Structure formats: structure tokens, C-alpha cells
Amino acid sequence: MEEFRRSYSRLCRESGAEPQEAVLQQLHQLPRGRLDLATQSLTVETCRALGKLLPRETLCTELVLSDCMLSEEGATLLLRGLCANTVLRFLDLKGNNLRAAGAEALGKLLQQNKSIQSLTLEWNSLGTWDDAFATFCGGLAANGALQRLDLRNNQISHKGAEELALALKGNTTLQQLDLRWNNVGLLGGRALMNCLPSNRTLWRLDLAGNNIPGDVLRAVEQAMGHSQDRLTTFQENQARTHVLSKEVQHLREEKSKQFLDLMETIDKQREEMAKSSRASAARVGQLQEALNERHSIINALKAKLQMTEAALALSEQKAQDLGELLATAEQEQLSLSQRQAKELKLEQQEAAERESKLLRDLSAANEKNLLLQNQVDELERKFRCQQEQLFQTRQEMTSMSAELKMRAIQAEERLDMEKRRCRQSLEDSESLRIKEVEHMTRHLEESEKAMQERVQRLEAARLSLEEELSRVKAAALSERGQAEEELIKAKSQARLEEQQRLAHLEDKLRLLAQARDEAQGACLQQKQVVAEAQTRVSQLGLQVEGLRRRLEELQQELSLKDQERVAEVSRVRVELQEQNGRLQAELAAQEALREKAAALERQLKVMASDHREALLDRESENASLREKLRLREAEIARIRDEEAQRASFLQNAVLAYVQASPVRTLSPPK
């Protein structure tokens, strides 16, 4: 910082002015990285020197120039020098009465500077000239580094707020914006509210003391809450990403360590393989010696083979002797076959007896099948009775649906009457509100003109006394306090008038509350009617559920009967097939018996096909009944949904009527 002091002194002397002792003292006591010139009256030469030094300064990250009473020229020179600075992060220009030229210089600063993150402009007059403030907003829209902006007490009107809203739509870095104690008004508040969905980074917006309705403030607070949630989520994601990146880096290090360990193990395995190859070479030598021994053993075996061939000749002679013995055995086998033929005849007689027994079993199975058929007919009669009961239930449901539709039509007619009456009352209240708003705007415009005239007079006095500013600074501060007291008195007078108008509006609110209570009574009556209809629908649903359970029980009984019959038929068929197989294996010559068995099988197939067709018919009838039952359930669900939808429509209409009351829009800001 010593170099900075020497450069400042040199530039001031080159311009023909002495350096300010207060500035030199602050530079001498300066902490590292922070230049605090607050409450120091900086001359134009000092501002020019600082504007030339700050672009090359690499240590100063914070610059405090609050209440320095900067002139337009001095502020322009200083801000022009900051355009090329790349290290400054915090800039405080509070209480310097910056106007048109200062606003334009700030706009250029925001366009060119890429390092300033916090900018404090409290107690200035940037919003007095719309064109200059539009230039400032253009610079804000193009800036990509600023995160915090303080614009309190800058006389920003609704037009300035609209320009600021356009800038916020293009800005992607600003996170905090303070607009307290300006003249934003209803139009400016709405413009700022409408720009918030386009801005994804702003999470704090202060609008207190701007004559903005409460509903707009609540909407802005809600949008800021969403932005804070997004910011929290983004920070959490960044933290998680950081943690995950650390984990990935740790895993990579572990993988590299594992790779090195793997390479070491591979080298060890290679050494072991070399050792094993040497051992295998020695083993091959041993195997070669063993192979030579085997060759000698094979030669010995060849000698044994010759001896075995001689023994084979002897065995052939023994085979001839065994052939003679075989001839005698064949004769014995012939006698045995004769005895087996006699036994076969006896088995054929037994098979005939078995066939007669099977025929008797088949007749018994036919009788049992007839009994099952009778049971199926009785179940069909019960099913027809259930179908008639279902038809009667359907008729009752149609009558109930017609009655519900009539009641719904009556409720809709009543709702239309209530809507017309509410619409008329809303139109009357809206016309009264418009008149009151016009009166209030005229009053505010007159007061604003008076204040502007007073400010212009004060500005003329300040310009005339600017040369003697160092001597009369205390007097200027006292006048500023008096102006603040007068402003507070004007605000208190406006607050009293607002309270009187609020009492008048509360009377109207009571009248509207009475109308709302009447509408709520009608809504409760409609809800009771809907509840009665729902209870009747639930009763019908219980009846349908009972019929469904009864139908399921009948289906279960029918399926059990079918399973028993199928099991019996399959058992009989299996027994017949087993008997048939044994008869075919034992009595190949008895063709007549085979034909009878085939006839029996054909009869069984015919019976099975008839039974299968009957089952298919029953299944189709059951499917049609299930489809009818499903349609009936869908009709009941649709009726329930219609009734619930109508009730929700009525409730939404009442809520919309209550929320559309003009009292909420005219309530004073908190």
C-alpha cells in the first residue's frame, strides 16, 4: 500500500492539486485488501487519481466510498477507472447522491467489470431519471459476476422497476436484491413478480416500503422461497458432487494401488511359472525314463500273448463240448414252451373275466355321470335366479342414477344463480376500488411533485454551496435530517388516510362476509344431498358385492364338481388304458376284444367332448355375467366421480368468490 500512497501523491501533484491528508491517513492505516474512505469529502482530482490507480491495483478487494458526497464528474472518473479492475469484489457507494451521470457510469461499470460481486448503492437518486436508470439496468443485464445489489432509497419508480425486471430476466448471477423504501408501486411490483419465473438464481428480494399490495408481496415471497429451495438443492448437489468426486479420486487411487499390487503378483507368478517350467523339464526326463521301462514291459507282454494264443486253441475245443450241451438245453426249452402255452390259455380266460368286470364298472360310471348332469342342471336354475336378481338390481340402479342426475341439475341451477349474484357484487366492488385507486394515485402524484420540487430546490442550494462544502457539511446534514423528518410526517399522514380507508373497506368486507355465509349455507345443503346420494350408492355397492360373493361361491362349487367329475373320468380312463395295454400285450390275437375297447374309448371321447362343450357354454355364460358386473361397477364408479367432481366445482366456486374479494388486493403492505 506504500506504493499506492506514493502514486496517489504523485498524480495529485501532476494535476496541480495537493493530495488530501484524510485520504493519505486512511491509506497509511489501511488494512490489507480493504480501502475505506467512508465520510471523506473526495475532490475531483482525488477521484481522477484513484481512477487511474485502481485499474492496476491488485491487492485491494474492498472499496468503501459511503457518504463521500461525490460529484457527478468525480464519480464518473472513479467508476471509469474501476471498469478495468479485475480484483475488486466489494464496492460501497452509499449516500453519494448519484444521479443521471452516475447511473450511466455504473451501467458501463457493470457491463465491463467482471470481478465485483457486491455493490451497495443505498441513499442515492439513481431512479430519478428513467433513461439513465435504463442504462444502469442494461449493464446489470449484461453483467455476469454481481451477486448482491443494494438499491434502497433510490427513488425508483414503477418504470424503473419495469426496466429492472427486464434486466433480471437476462441476468444469471444476481442472488440478492434490496429495493426497500422506493416508489415501485403496484405496477412495478407486478413487473418484478412476473420476471421471477425467468430468473433462476435470485433467492432474496426485499420490497418493503414500496406501496406494493400484500398479495404481490406474498407472491414474491413465495417465489423467493422456491428460489431458496432451488439454491439449497443446488448447494446440496454441489456438496454431493464434491463428495462423489473425492470418492472417485479415492477409488482411482485405490485402483492404481490395486493395479500395482496386481503387477507385483503377476511378476511373482511369472517367477513361479519359470520355477515350475524348470521342475516340469526335470519331470519330463523322469517320464522318459519311465517310458523306456514301459517298452521293456510291453516286450514281456508280447511273450505272454503267444502263450495266451496257445491257451485259446485249448478253449476252442472246450467250446465244441459246450455246443453239445446247448442242444440238450434247447430240447428242455421246447418242453418249457409247451407248458407256457397252457398257462397262456388260462390267462386268456382270466382276461375275459376282467373284461366283463370293466364293462360293469363302465355302466356304473355312466350312472354317476347322469347324477352329475342333474346337479349341473340344478346349478343352472340357481344361476338363472341370481341373474333375475341382478336384473332387478340394475333397474334400481338406473332409477337411482336418474334421481341423482335430477338433483345434480337442480344444484347446478342454484350454483348459476349464486355465480350471477356474486359476479354483480364483484363488479360493484371493482368499480368502487378503481375510483379509490384513481383518487390515491392523484394524491400520490401531487405529493411526489411537491417532493420533487423540494428536492430540486435543495439541489440548487447544494450546487451553489458546493465550493464551501467542507465548511457547511454539518449544516447540510442537519437539513437532510429535517427533510427526513418531513418525509416521516408525510408518511404518517398517508398512513392515517390509509387507515380511514381501511375502516371503510372493512365495513364492505362484513357485508361480503354475510353474502359468503349464505353461499356457504347453500353449499352445505348441496354437500348433504351429495352425501345422501353417496350413502345410497354405497348401499347398492354392498348389495352388488354380496351378489358377487354369491356368484363366486357358485362358481367355486361348480368348479369343485367339475374337478371331481374330471378326476373320476380321468381315473376311469387311466384304468381302462392300463387294462387295454395289458390285454393288448397278453392277447395280441384277440382282435374282437380290441375293437370293443376302441368302441368304449370312442364313447368316452364323445362323452368328454359333450361335457367339454357344456363347460364352455357355462364359462361363456359366466364371462358374460362378469362383464355385465364389471360394467355395472364402472357405472357406479362414474356416478361417484361425477358427484365428487360437482361437489369440488361448487367448493372451488365458493373459494374463488371469497378469494376474489377486493379487500385482499387493497390491504396495506406489512
Swiss-Prot record:
SMART domains linked: LRR_RI
Subcellular location: Cytoplasm, Cytoskeleton, Microtubule organizing center, Centrosome
Per-repeat ranges for LRR: 58-80, 87-107, 115-136, 145-166, 173-194, 201-212
Key words of the record: Coiled coil, Cytoplasm, Cytoskeleton, Leucine-rich repeat, Phosphoprotein, Repeat
The UniProt record lists the keyword Phosphoprotein: yes
Processing after translation: Phosphorylated by NEK2 during misosis, phosphorylation reduces centrosomal localization which subsequently leads to centrosome separation.
Modified residues (Phosphoserine): 661
InterPro entries linked: Centro_Cilium_Assembly, Leu-rich_rpt, LRR_dom_sf
Principal subcellular localisation of the protein: cytoplasm
Coiled-coil spans in chain: 252-645
Superkingdom to which the source organism belongs: Eukaryota
Pfam families: LRR_6 (PF13516)
One CC-aspect GO term: centrosome
Subunit: Homomer. Interacts with CROCC/rootletin and CEP250. Interacts with CEP44. Interacts with CCDC102B (via N-terminus).
Protein purpose: Component of the proteinaceous fiber-like linker between two centrioles, required for centrosome cohesion.
Protein known as: Leucine-rich repeat-containing protein 45
Gene assigned in the entry: LRRC45
